[in-house]
Amino acid sequence: MVSPLHLFLQLLFVIYSLPDIHAVMIQDKVRTSTYANFILTNPTLFRDAVVLDVGCGTGILSLFAAKAGAKRVFAVDASDIAEKAEKIVKANGLANIITVIHGKIEEISLPEGINQVDIIISEWMGYALLYESMLNSVLHARDRFLRPGGVMAPSQCRMMLGLCDGSEIHKDRIGFWEDVYGMQCDTFVISLQ
């Protein structure tokens, strides 16, 4: 039997092969400009560095790293978006610096006999730090590929929680099953709770 986690991850690979989700992430100006500012305003950190982009998506962080002076960038993604990332890299004239690798970070080897990288970059946190389920993959990449004293960006996060009243959401999402156009469908609610 296939585990629910395995099914969830397979679904994520399908979703992340589509351009829509990447458009949403890149159009998040705070998120993308924060990465761009960090990478592009730290040329001494990135100059001549070997960089690993875990879960590269469209390759936007890899492009920033190459523009900041990275010697080599390995952009890894398990979904089919890697094929589009490769086209984007070529369209920007950076194929001599950026190598796109289509595969799971846990299963790939870096080419050119490279075993360690100087910097790992990744947009692993998704929404609310947990959505993309990438943290374990990034930690695997860190333990396997990051040289001692290397940089992981981002390297820390903080999650803050606040209480709220969800009764309206419950009413909209769960309560409405009690009367669906005059029909009783509340047996469906049991599977949602």
Model-derived features: positions:
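Class I SAM-binding transferase module
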Residues: M1-V54, T58-Q193
